[in-house]
């Protein structure tokens, strides 16, 4: 199912959406934060999807618990370190971990730039202990408005040498991409690549805007592109990568079932598409789960799954020499 001669990557993976249940428990107790349960076992349903839950509101509440326990910068560093460990232990060769410093900072009023530094330090520490390649993507959380995104951008750009790209995430309908054109001009001027969450809650116009105005070369989710034949043609022709997260799309009710997921439609149209976990801590999944689902529910053949693996490497924010090194390590 997973081809061991091809690098296994996860490109759409939120660091702040992957906090271990026991870490939430320990940090909550360490910092005197009231948790919604009185044991580790009973905490799990409050912070992870159980069974067939498919509610965006419930999903976001679980996600909020993951940052609610980030009471100091040591907690942030620990979570970053554990993200590297989890990526390595799940069999990944390469992962791009994205994070929103504003979202991580806001509960306990941590300094935004301090959060960025703690994430970088935690990742560096993890890379000393685990064999996996990691790059970081900064997120601007549009839901908090333009001014908050400016703060976030400045904290991230102060450490741009540790980032490969910037992302725009959050409330796509309430805060459309055009509100952030100036922010992304600064990102382009800084020489960083751009990905954006688009076509998830909003229609294809959101994706056009992200590509043509923000400068995105990859799109997170993008499920609504399938309703716009011209966009599908454009995506295929220009090799705009779709970071697809099927289980997350089900959990957030972006799609009502795996059978309705448009992954196959993208593949048949020749669009560059990869499999990713999104918020693996909330969804209680790893990358191998997504490949199992792609085979059993999305009906992809082993040859198609191998192509999806290759797509991920092609889409990755890596230099050609780094890509070759990933392949060489699998030989």
UniProtKB/Swiss-Prot annotation:
The lineage of its organism: Bacteria, Pseudomonadati, Pseudomonadota, Gammaproteobacteria, Alteromonadales. Its EC number is 3.5.4.4. It comes from Shewanella sp. (strain MR-4). Keywords: Hydrolase, Metal-binding, Nucleotide metabolism, Zinc. The gene is add. Binds 1 zinc ion per subunit. Catalyzes the hydrolytic deamination of adenosine and 2-deoxyadenosine. One of its GO terms (cellular component) is cytosol. The active site is at 200 (proton donor). GO terms for biological process: adenosine catabolic process; hypoxanthine salvage; inosine biosynthetic process; nucleotide metabolic process; purine ribonucleoside monophosphate biosynthetic process. GO terms for molecular function: 2'-deoxyadenosine deaminase activity; adenosine deaminase activity; zinc ion binding. This is Adenosine deaminase. The keyword Ribonucleoprotein does not apply. Coiled coil: none annotated.
